């Protein structure tokens, strides 16, 4: 994953002498044919233009173009021509029309989403105080026999999940006054009233664009999902498969909150809604990009999480088409890029001057780390220091 974010006013995208040229005020980016490093362009701007030739150039280079609304939600998108597979689509419709098949696929989606959500919560329990009582109890109540009861089951787990995430959000950024998502599982929170929901909306828009691109690549129909209901102008299959990777966005948002964002990093509109400033959006996209570009073991090899996304969508198509008899999504748990666990932080805070001398830890280093811990900030522990503390 390597998106290019264009944010602000006066953006012009055109083609000159076969080169794609992107202009914004005094900044000019130029790309030769077959030498553009980006796989998508995200436009979060208000005024600008793009030529027909530039749209052709991007399509020929398999670069998707996503246009975000003023509130950070995905407004529209251009994708390379979809894979045409009528037989696959017919079988996709047949699976949807068969209640048993539909419930099975929807159940597998929820099963993997719960696994990924729990993986994130358990990983965060090394750094934040997490109460597993409610969420573990709800997971054990996996009793459903139709889509409605399945959604109720998932909704109860989502409530417990967001309750724990809310604690982390408010510990990191108490001034942001986060309460929860408006609808915990199946919502499109179009207008954010607080910075954290604005970050989540923006991240989910990036995720939606990526999932849609790969559904397009495989040749499935985005308008026919299994967990989410069919509705005019909606893309239920996109929303279904988004559920499998929402945890990556949730983690990315917590990562950016750990950098100590301020209210000044956001814009308050005249309608009292919140949107991201350009630099904040770039920072969030960078976190999301890095997380999807991380490599994990998958089918006995190392793949980026983005490639694993594509392979899981391909697995769904193989099940739908009858090439495999059972469906199982396989998505790795997130790997947190921190080593200052609660245990380590408590150890550091317990070190007095005499203990410091005994451990041969630099005085200024210890003072700085203890100061950051008191302020609730993350710290980096080098292996040499970690060995001494443990």
What spans do the regions from the language model cover?
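Active-site helix-to-loop segments that bind/position phosphate- or nucleotide-bearing substrates
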Residues: 1-18, 23-25, 33, 60, ...
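Short Lys/Arg-enriched helix C-cap and helix-to-coil transition segments
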Residues: 374-390
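Short, amphipathic alpha-helical "recognition" segments used to contact nucleic acids or chromatin
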Residues: 336-354
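Short hydrophobic alpha-helical runs that function as membrane-insertion/retention elements
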Residues: 41-44, 63-69
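Residues in the recognition helix of alpha-helical DNA-binding motifs
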Residues: 369-370
């Amino acid at each position: 994953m390597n998106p290019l974010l264009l944010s602000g006013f006066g953006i012009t995208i055109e083609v000159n002498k076969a080169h794609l040229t992107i202009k914004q005020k005094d900044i000019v980016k130029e790309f030769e044919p077959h030498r553009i490093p980006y796989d998508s362009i995200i436009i979060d701007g208000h005024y600008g233009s793009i030529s027909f030739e530039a749209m052709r150039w991007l399509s020929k280079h398999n670069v998707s173009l996503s246009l975000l609304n003023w509130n950070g939600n995905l407004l529209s998108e251009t994708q390379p021509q979809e894979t045409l597979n009528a037989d696959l689509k017919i079988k996709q419709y047949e699976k949807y029309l068969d209640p048993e098949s539909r419930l099975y696929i929807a159940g597998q989606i929820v099963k993997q989403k719960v696994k990924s959500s729990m993986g994130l919560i358990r990983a965060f329990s090394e750094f934040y105080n997490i109460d597993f009582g409610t969420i573990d109890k709800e997971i054990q109540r996996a009793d459903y026999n139709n889509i409605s009861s399945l959604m109720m089951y998932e909704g109860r787990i989502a409530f417990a999940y967001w309750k724990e995430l809310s604690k982390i959000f408010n510990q990191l950024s108490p001034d942001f006054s986060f309460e929860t998502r408006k609808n915990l599982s199946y919502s499109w929170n179009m207008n954010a009233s607080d910075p954290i929901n604005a970050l989540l909306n923006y991240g989910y828009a990036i995720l939606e664009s990526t999932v849609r691109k790969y559904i397009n690549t495989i040749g499935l129909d985005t308008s026919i999902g299994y967990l989410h209901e069919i509705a005019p102008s909606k893309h239920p299959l996109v929303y279904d498969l988004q559920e499998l990777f929402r945890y990556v966005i949730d983690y990315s948002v917590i990562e950016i909150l750990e950098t100590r964002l301020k209210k000044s990093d956001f814009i308050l509109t005249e309608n009292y809604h919140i949107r991201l400033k350009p630099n904040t959006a770039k920072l969030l996209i960078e976190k999301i990009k890095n997380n999807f570009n991380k490599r994990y073991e998958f089918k006995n090899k190392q793949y980026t999480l983005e490639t694993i996304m594509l392979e899981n969508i391909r697995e769904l198509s193989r099940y739908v088409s009858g090439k495999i008899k059972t469906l199982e999504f396989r998505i790795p748990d997130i790997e947190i890029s921190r080593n200052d666990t609660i245990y380590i932080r408590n150890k550091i805070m317990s070190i007095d001057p005499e203990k410091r001398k005994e451990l041969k830890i630099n005085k200024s280093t210890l003072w700085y780390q203890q100061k950051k811990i008191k302020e609730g900030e993350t710290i980096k522990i080098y292996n040499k220091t970690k060995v001494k503390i443990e």
